[in-house]
């Protein structure tokens, strides 16, 4: 039970950009913002549990936070982790129908 709760906290949100839409069309890969402590096996298990699809490969990367400036103060956004999840052929994640 504790492991399932941990898996639910791993996937933060989907990451949508021009690059991810091109990768989705060409390689059937989805992009997610994930927890920084998540490993590739954790991400794979979380996607299998939530969406019931078979994952082919996963590529992860740490995205550096941007520097933000407001008046004379310089702040910084925190780093975050992004995962590209490539599904097997014929597999598809339907985000609309998975939410109940």
From Swiss-Prot:
Belongs to the universal ribosomal protein uL23 family. The keyword Ribonucleoprotein applies. Coiled coil: none annotated. Disulfide bonds: none annotated. This is Large ribosomal subunit protein uL23. Keywords: Ribonucleoprotein, Ribosomal protein, RNA-binding, rRNA-binding. GO terms for biological process: translation. It comes from the Bacteria. It holds the Pfam family Ribosomal_L23. One of its GO terms (cellular component) is ribonucleoprotein complex. One of its GO terms (molecular function) is structural constituent of ribosome. The gene is rplW. Part of the 50S ribosomal subunit. Contacts protein L29, and trigger factor when it is bound to the ribosome. One of the early assembly proteins it binds 23S rRNA. One of the proteins that surrounds the polypeptide exit tunnel on the outside of the ribosome. Forms the main docking site for trigger factor binding to the ribosome.
């Amino acid at each position: 039970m504790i492991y399932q709760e941990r898996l639910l906290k791993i996937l933060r949100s989907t990451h949508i950009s021009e690059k991810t839409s091109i990768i989705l069309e060409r390689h059937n890969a989805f992009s997610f913002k994930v927890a920084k402590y998540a490993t590739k096996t954790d991400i794979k298990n979380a996607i299998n549990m939530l969406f019931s699809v078979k994952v082919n490969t996963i590529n992860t990367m740490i995205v550096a936070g941007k520097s933000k400036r407001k008046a004379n103060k310089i702040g910084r956004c925190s780093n975050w982790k992004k995962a590209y999840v490539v599904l097997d052929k014929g597999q598809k994640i339907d985000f609309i129908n998975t939410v109940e």
